[in-house]
């Protein structure tokens, strides 16, 4: 039986490498990145040029779209000139080439301003004394977007563009509002005890998206591990996709 062909745009970054390493044994994986990497399955192209990337979409089952400047502190000029165009081009190339599904790497920063409100501000500050983690109101994907900067605005644009291509062209687009993923694969500050997405759970989430039913045409999902102080709702990730996180950031508490 032939393996599904998976294309990862922006494949040479941290998240791209985690996903590539985590799924390569199950799928035929090729990557695109503007950086020239000494890997025969990664091709050096720039996603801001539709003509450059289009040939690589032929025969692909699922695209994992990571191509963007990953810094949450990127100025609007970078988001406008790079991230928006990369996202739109990926969706357009997918439709033009008959790709079935795009997994769009959105971000928790599309709703980051909720962290100014209680109880979320107390959680990300580590002020747990007056909180009952068992009864926290969770932030759901049907709540209004509240971007916390140009980067978050760009991710909200990507979700909207994905909805358009899904409705207009029948493309399946699954948007992942990814939590905290870092090289160390552990919490590095107090906020991360709520927001960590471990490398292993990231791979689990991506595989669940790849294998989700074909009739799942659009969805927005938070990507986070099963952390005690998690305040993003992942019930739709579990119900729609079968995502089952295994890790909890509390395992790192008081280990330093």
Name each model-derived stretch.
Residues 89-144, 148:
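Conserved Rossmann-fold NAD(P)-dependent oxidoreductase catalytic core, especially the SDR/UDP-sugar
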Residues 218-244:
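Conserved C-terminal active-site "lid" loop/helix of NAD(P)H-dependent oxidoreductases
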Residues 167, 177-185, 196-218, 226:
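Alpha-helical substrate-binding/gating segment
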Residues 4-25:
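N-terminal Rossmann NAD(P)H-binding glycine-rich loop of SDR-like oxidoreductase domains
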Residues 78-89, 97, 153-156, 197:
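Glycine-rich NAD(P)-binding loop of the Rossmann-fold in SDR/ketoreductase-type enzymes
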Residues 46-82, 93:
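NAD(P)H-binding glycine-rich loop region in Rossmannoid oxidoreductase-like domains
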Residues 106, 149, 159-184:
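Conserved beta-loop-beta element that borders a ligand/cofactor-binding pocket
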Residues 30-52:
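Adenosine-cofactor binding site in Rossmann-like domains, unifying the SAM/SAH pocket
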């Amino acid at each position: 039986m032939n393996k599904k062909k998976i294309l990862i745009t922006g494949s040479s970054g941290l998240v791209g490498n985690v996903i590539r390493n985590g799924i390569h044994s199950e799928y035929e994986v090729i990557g695109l990145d503007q950086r020239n990497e000494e890997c025969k399955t990664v091709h050096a192209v720039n996603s801001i040029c539709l003509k450059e990337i289009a040939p690589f979409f032929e025969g692909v089952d699922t695209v994992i779209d990571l191509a963007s400047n990953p810094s949450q502190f990127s100025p609007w000029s970078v988001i406008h000139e790079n991230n928006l165009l990369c996202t739109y081009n990926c969706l357009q190339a997918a439709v033009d080439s008959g790709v079935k599904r795009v997994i769009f790497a959105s971000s928790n920063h599309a709703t980051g301003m909720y962290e100014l409100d209680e109880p979320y501000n107390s959680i990300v500050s580590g002020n747990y004394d007056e909180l009952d983690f068992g009864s926290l109101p969770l932030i759901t994907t049907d709540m209004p977007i509240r971007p916390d900067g140009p980067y978050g605005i760009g991710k909200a644009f990507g979700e909207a563009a994905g909805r358009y291509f899904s409705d207009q062209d029948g493309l399946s687009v699954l948007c992942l509002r990814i939590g905290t993923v870092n090289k160390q694969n552990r919490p590095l500050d107090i906020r991360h005890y709520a927001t960590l997405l471990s490398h292993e759970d990231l791979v689990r989430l991506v595989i669940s998206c790849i294998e989700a039913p074909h009739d799942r045409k659009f969805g927005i999902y938070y990507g986070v591990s099963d952390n005690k102080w998690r305040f993003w709702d992942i019930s739709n990730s579990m119900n729609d996709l079968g995502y089952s996180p295994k890790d909890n950031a509390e395992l790192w508490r008081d280990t330093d």
